[in-house]
Amino acid sequence: TYYKKRMKAIVDCNSFYCSCERLFKPHLDDKPVVVLSNNDGCIISRSDEAKILGVEMAGPYFKAKPLIEKYGVATFSSNYNLYGDLSWRVMETLRVLVGRENVEVYSVDEAFLNLDEFAETDLQKAGLKIRATVEEWTGIKVSVGVAPTKVLSKVSNHLAKKNKLATQCVVVLDTKEKIAT
């Protein structure tokens, strides 16, 4: 059974704060990066490379500092003006792609999309187009999860992020069989 009507997507920016910092520092692409909270107390964003090294999310900076120094992890104080500006650009891109009325901003780096108007299209291709366009227009990489409900779209987004290479950062759960697995 295919779910063709009432499809939802969530577009989630990948390691958003780190991605924003890298956008203006391209020499950090493929290098470990972390962003710290206000007053540099905790780690609030980690690049995939920092995750692989074992840098913990929300961990106190002073505890992670030896690991960060050992591996030369690029470390940034949070820059909320930059993140807000790039968030706005990502959300505006989504509004252009699916219509303003079909975008529900969920957080600074996430938005739900109503894909009812796209029900007859290939949702995998639509997700790939959304991902590619956001990256092309803003420089920010995103993952896209598509499913009949918001909760399932969050699950599909998690699956997309879990294996970025195989999924191309897009997973569509549009059948009972896909949802069951």
Model-identified regions with their sequence ranges:
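Gly/Gly-Pro- and Ser/Thr-rich, intrinsically disordered tail segments characteristic of DNA damage-repair
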Residues: Y2-T181
